[in-house]
Amino acid sequence: MAIIFNPNKKIFTLQTAHTTYQMQVDRLGYLLHLYYGAKNTCDMDYVLTYADRGFSGNPYAAGMNRTYSLDTLPQEYPTLGTGDFRNIALDIKNEHGTESVELLYKSHEIRDGKYALKGLPAVWASDDEAQTLEIVLGDDIAGVEVHLLYGVLEACDVITRSVLIKNTGSGNITIEKAHAACLDMVYGDYDVIRFYGKHAMERNLERTHLGHGTLSFGSRRGTSSHQYNPAVILAQRDTTENAGGCYGMLFVYSGNFSCEAEKDQINQTRLLMGLSDELFSYPLAAGETFTVPEVIMSYSADGFSQLSHQYHTCISEHVCRSRFAHEVRPVLINSWEAAYFDFTGDTIVDLAKEAASLGIDMVVMDDGWFGKRDDDNSSLGDWFVNEKKLGGTLSELIDRVHAQGVKFGIWIEPEMVNEDSNLYREHPDWAIQIPGKLPVRSRNQLILDFSRKEVRDNIFDQICAVFDQGKIDYVKWDMNRSMADVYAGNLAYDYVLGVYDFMERLVTRYPDILLEGCSGGGGRFDAGMLYYSPQIWCSDNTDAINRTRIQYGTSFFYPVSTMGAHVSAVPNHQTGRVTSLKTRGITAMAGTFGYELNPALLSDEEKEEIREQIKTFKKYEMLINEGTYWRLTSPFEDEVAAWMSVSRAKDRALVSVVRLYAEANAATYYVKLKGLESDAVYIEENTGRQYTGAALMNAGIPLPFATKEYEAYQFSFIRLDEAKKLYDEIKKVCGNLKLNEADTADSASDNRIVISIYGGSGSGKTTIAAALQQYFLNDNTACYVLTGDNYPHRIPMRNDEERLNVYNESGEDGLRGYLGTPKEIDFDRINKELSEFKAGKDIIEIKHMGREDGDISYDETDFTGIKVLILEWTHGGSEYLKGVDIPVFLESSPEETKARRIKRGRDENAASPFICRVVELEQEKLDLQGKNARIVVGKDGKVYEQ
């Protein structure tokens, strides 16, 4: 069980896979916090210490005991008016103006499954994935009951917290402050990491040492805001990406919030997260219940990367509900930076035609399609289609776009209204305003009062009337201002619940519409929004260099699959910076990927590059979105921004690097990878170079010398699973051979084996042989790779000429009698070398052949201590070859062989009819030789003995 209650000590223990959270009901009935950190099974009540500290109050129930004080004890949910003078989680005012609530334990319940919150987004899980602990605390005199909710997701290493506040008295009360979670630590040397920003530059990481006093941040803007994200990390001073302890709190809420970190008089630490108490004063009548939104907590003993992975898993698996969360999503192009307000229906159709030709999946018609909306001064609230502007109905436009083979998306901003709109003229009171005062404008618009159901219903009906006109595939929901005219203490909270109600109705009615959140970019990028929309436009800033910072900060809590990221035009519309299309593409691939530009203005070369970009993204999309994301550098500190995605099986990895700064004669920069298997062998797709996982993680890969500023690179690594499977199979076949033991005079020949790797040209013989050699070396078995390309009688060019001569003189039968026989191959030579190796000879003269006339040599090679000789060669299964112990055949077809030969570009005549026929004849012989193989590597990657 994830939740355990010790009735003797009244200790609650919450266990996840790697963490433990513990609290205790003490003898006076107070709920004290004991421990949160790395997993252990000990009762941690010994951490509580008691001392007589001046000016620290003592509860009356403690009698004359001056060592007992809530001002110094670690509490689970501290309240105002109890003698605790630190920051508190709850402040309630009664109808007489008194602010004092003393919460004592009443009861608890442990149940399977994860609690849900009425009207609020929250982590969800099945009954076998989570458990819930509900602890009831109360103050009978104040008439208040507080239900502390804990959700334990064991596999995710996540604990969620929420609070229900009930008015159990007969009069009214007012909630002045309500936080969802408090974490009290009996020690106090921490750093606080927060994510600050501004419009078009969100979620910059800032790390601050927590000194005495309070460090606080939050939002009073009505949204979670561009300025501070509702997320915090409390870290040990020496914590890095890969080591050290750190705690995370993430608020599942899209409105005003507050986070407070305090180091008190005796160096203890308190961390609070919840609703902002500014512009908040919530009345609660007798019998009513108030719900505090949820906080997701997690702890990592292994640095920030592990903490991020825990949050990424929780959000992607237990917050995002959309069916699109784990599906391939469309590559889209948005009309905004292509046309802004200046477009017609034909403009959108032309954009769709261009998109289809580039391989883009969807066109999104952004702001300007409704009412009389030709600028940002009018028509918000009037959600009817401007058919004059579009040149027809929306249904007709959607059909025209779909006819181009692309999907159709549309932009909305339901929460806003312009004063120049029919809606405002009919219902001016529906806009949020302080009675008797003129409202604060922003972007020439006001906010509709979504706390009122009749307002929501009107807009919902308008929006549905639009959506029902045709098959809309995608909706971008925007929100382009902050809330200023807060006329009541309950408004900000009720407004957010109204937005959630609207979104719930929308996604329920249109489950097949992909919904993307937006608030001037990343002004409402939070877990609350992700409950309804699986992705959010990360920032209005599409500059590739700025985006490395924005996406870096975002990644600490939110998975890549949630980050809307697009390639935009240059000079960039926000910064004026010019970066290459390649750099813009690589940066946007660290998100949902799309385009914000006018393709009609692109050159043919740029269009072709975009086609290749899209192919690349689609090749790696599931790896990027479903893989484990690793930050390799910090764009705030390093000269490059580097990140990577590793598949869950660790068999594939994609590394992306952007040079942020360059200088003359710079030192070579090495990027160290993460998350790979140390002993596995990986091949880099573009170069064919092989590495062990340990080498990539410990030594890294060098960037090309003289990398230019803003230049970008991608490296794709594939684990050579066939080689590992082959190695394991060979070990079985080898039986009792002691290959990793030193030779004796009698054993040198007995313990030597020859393995041949053979198959069609380009079938991967060289790759598998090199990887197989590495696996032997990993096992302390010395191994040598011999290439059969050294053993024809003639260099490659002359051999091709001889093949053609034979064909011209003797036809196909003569060519068949030449290929792979002693007429073409010096079998005597290679058999001699293999025989000497098997006999235990240490110095063997090995033949080497180049590609130019006369480029043939014989070099003495030291085989001392070498136990395994791997021969990689097309003819490694030939009847003329002697001394092979384990022949291994790589299956391939002539078509595959031809395609590989052409792709590798080593032979300029690879596609000629004659060479293709040679390949077919060789394959005929290989198919026969394959029957003699001891081990076969199938085209499906399976390895089996025959």
Language-model features: locations:
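Polysaccharide-binding surfaces and accessory modules of carbohydrate-active proteins
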Residues: 5, 10-13, 17, 21, ...
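Carbohydrate-binding surface patches
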Residues: 241, 634-677
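Aromatic-lined carbohydrate-binding/catalytic grooves of carbohydrate-active enzymes
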Residues: 324-461, 474
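Active-site neighborhood of glycoside hydrolase catalytic domains
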Residues: 389-393, 425-582, 592-597, 601
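C-terminal beta-strand-rich structural cap/linker in extracellular carbohydrate-active enzymes
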Residues: 693-722
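Conserved nucleotide-sensing/catalytic segment adjacent to the nucleotide-binding pocket
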Residues: 784, 793-850
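ATP-dependent NMP and nucleoside kinases share a basic, alpha-helical "lid"
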Residues: 856-904
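Small-molecule kinase domains that catalyze NTP-dependent phosphoryl transfer to phosphate-bearing small molecules
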Residues: 906-946
